[in-house]
Amino acid sequence: MVKTNPKVDTENEKSYLTVEEFNAIRKMDLPKDFLDFLEIGFRTGLRAADILNLKKENVKLKKDDNGNSTGHIQGTALKTKSQTPINIRLDQKSLSILKDRMGNIKSEFLFANRSGNPYTIEYFKKYFRKAFDQLYPDMALHKSIHAIRSGNRKFLEMYNLN
């Protein structure tokens, strides 16, 4: 449970997912698909729709000069009018998650249900809401699933990665 009171803490009044909330949710007993979705959204800043439509072909893996794995997500953003190209360098945690999903999922989609179809956003919203029920059991505080993406900026600033 997060120790701050969101009614008093102005940082939590923001619409983004805070780093503290992110870290607390990561430790919860929730489905791996949801936790992977959370990690990728928070670490990359991708929109939920873009994560749900990620395909194996969008993840570009290679080795650097030292033999270490590196990777990028490449594709086109779905929710932009100009069809903005996506080219996001992956940190080691995101890279590990996506490599694991690429090796263990038969579907071309990296976030697919048992039928091989991409999950719906409703699936992830359900667990995001459940996470907030656990974080703030005495309060009716819930954030939009889009708060995951919004928290990315603060996460990057916190670790001097922006």
What are these regions (language model features)?
Residues 15, 27-28, 84, 88, ...:
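Helix-turn-helix-type domain boundary/helix-start signal
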